[in-house]
Amino acid sequence: MLGLIQRVRRASVEVDQQVVGEIDQGMLLLLGIQKTDTEASADKLIDKLLAYRLFADADNRMNCNLQQVDGGILVVSQFTLAADTKKGLRPSFSSAAPPAQAQQLYDYFVTQLRSRHAKVATGIFAADMQVSLVNDGPVTFMLEMD
C-alpha cells in the first residue's frame, strides 16, 4: 500500500464540479493500492499516518502528529501511484490491485481510519476527481507498507 502524504493548510476534492470532500489544516493522502496489499497493510498505514510527525511544534520542529494538531485528513484514491515507470515511456499498472480488490481495501481503509480519527474526508473511488490544495511547506512524504 502506497501513501503520498502532503501537509496542507486546506484541501478539497471535486467530482462533476461538486465538492465531495474538504479539510482545513491537515494531511492530503493520495492512496495507491497494489495487488499484494491486505487489510493488514491498511492497518499498518493507518497506524503510521496517525503517528507520523509532520507538523511543527512550538520550536518549529516536525514533532507533532495529525491528532496532536487536531488536523483533518483527505483521502483520495490514486491507482497511478502503483505504476512501474522503470522501462519505456508508458507506465505499466501491472502491480496495481484490480478494481474490485482495490475498492474493498479502500473502503476498509476509510472505515478503519474513521473509527480512529474524527476528521476524515474522502474523494470518490475510481471517479475523475479534481484535487485542490494549499501545500504547507511544502512537506511531502511517500510511505510504503508491505
Curated annotation (Swiss-Prot):
EC? Answer: 3.1.1.96
Pfam assignment, any one: Tyr_Deacylase
* Key word Cytoplasm present: yes
GO terms under cellular component: cytoplasm
Q: Name one GO biological process term.
A: D-amino acid catabolic process
Q: Position of motif Gly-cisPro motif, important for rejection of L-amino acids?
A: 137-138
* InterPro entries from the UniProt entry: Daa-tRNA_deacyls_DTD, DTD-like_sf
Q: Which reaction does it catalyse?
A: glycyl-tRNA(Ala) + H2O = tRNA(Ala) + glycine + H(+); a D-aminoacyl-tRNA + H2O = a tRNA + a D-alpha-amino acid + H(+)
Q: Record's superkingdom?
A: Bacteria
UniProt keywords (A-Z) are: Cytoplasm, Hydrolase, RNA-binding, tRNA-binding
Keyword tRNA-binding annotated: yes
Name where it's found.
Answer: Cytoplasm
Identify the Gene3D superfamilies for this entry: D-tyrosyl-tRNA(Tyr) deacylase (3.50.80.10)
Q: CDD domains from the xrefs?
A: Dtyr_deacylase (cd00563)
Primary localization class, coarse: cytoplasm
Q: Which GO terms describe its molecular function?
A: D-tyrosyl-tRNA(Tyr) deacylase activity; Gly-tRNA(Ala) deacylase activity; Ser(Gly)-tRNA(Ala) hydrolase activity; tRNA binding
Domain annotation text? Answer: A Gly-cisPro motif from one monomer fits into the active site of the other monomer to allow specific chiral rejection of L-amino acids.
Question: What is its biological role?
Answer: An aminoacyl-tRNA editing enzyme that deacylates mischarged D-aminoacyl-tRNAs. Also deacylates mischarged glycyl-tRNA(Ala), protecting cells against glycine mischarging by AlaRS. Acts via tRNA-based rather than protein-based catalysis; rejects L-amino acids rather than detecting D-amino acids in the active site. By recycling D-aminoacyl-tRNA to D-amino acids and free tRNA molecules, this enzyme counteracts the toxicity associated with the formation of D-aminoacyl-tRNA entities in vivo and helps enforce protein L-homochirality.
Family the entry assigns? Belongs to the DTD family.
Question: How the protein assembles, per its UniProt entry?
Answer: Homodimer.
Protein name, entry field: D-aminoacyl-tRNA deacylase
